[in-house]
Amino acid sequence: MALVSLKLQWADGADTSVPLPAYETSGAAGADIRANCPDGPVTLAPGARALVPTGLRMAIPQGYEVQIRPRSGLALRHGITLVNSPGTIDSDYRGAVGVIMQNLGDAAFEITHGMRIAQMVVAPVVQASFELSDSLSETDRGSGGFGSTGGD
């Protein structure tokens, strides 16, 4: 497994005692990232969303991105997910990282200081060149979409 060096820095006002992102198992693809809200918890009412600070800034190597993804346990047990999943942090962004969380559950949910709120996955980036064409190659699927490949 290749290791990519990701430089981290505390954002202004962050509590530097909050643990840094960490892989919880040797086979984990995503490192858990935590809420850094030293001024108090963030309460999400049902249907509400909020930008939750992580207290981190990062320098992602060129040719990579960081994807921010929901934690499955929060989604299953509480209906907590991320609005723009996966969220992308580009290699040229240097600002504070926040996680846009949403409560799809039936009860209010409290995001506490230091809570594991999301996973971050470091992934390679491939950029494409875009060009208009007079024709596209034919496929068996053609223009079928939105459920066209299955019976249900």
Curated annotation (Swiss-Prot):
User: Do you know which InterPro entries this protein is assigned to?
Assistant: dUTPase, dUTPase-like, dUTPase-like_sf, dUTPase_trimeric
Q: Which UniProt keywords apply?
A: Hydrolase, Magnesium, Metal-binding, Nucleotide metabolism
EC assignment: the record states 3.6.1.23
Annotated GO biological processes are: dUMP biosynthetic process; dUTP catabolic process
Q: Where does substrate bind?
A: 71-73, 84, 88-90
Catalytic reaction annotation: dUTP + H2O = dUMP + diphosphate + H(+)
Q: GO MF annotations for this entry? A: dUTP diphosphatase activity; magnesium ion binding
Cofactor annotation: Mg(2+)
User: Gene3D superfamilies in the record, alphabetically?
Assistant: 2.70.40.10
Q: In which pathway does it act?
A: Pyrimidine metabolism; dUMP biosynthesis; dUMP from dCTP (dUTP route): step 2/2
Q: Name one Pfam family in it.
A: dUTPase
Task: List where the protein spans the membrane.
Answer: none
The free-text function statement in the UniProt record for this protein reads: This enzyme is involved in nucleotide metabolism: it produces dUMP, the immediate precursor of thymidine nucleotides and it decreases the intracellular concentration of dUTP so that uracil cannot be incorporated into DNA.
What HAMAP family does UniProt report for this protein, alphabetically?
dUTPase_bact (MF_00116)
Q: Which family does it belong to?
A: Belongs to the dUTPase family.
What is this protein's name? Deoxyuridine 5'-triphosphate nucleotidohydrolase
Source organism of the structure: Roseobacter denitrificans (strain ATCC 33942 / OCh 114) (Erythrobacter sp. (strain OCh 114))
The gene behind this protein is dut
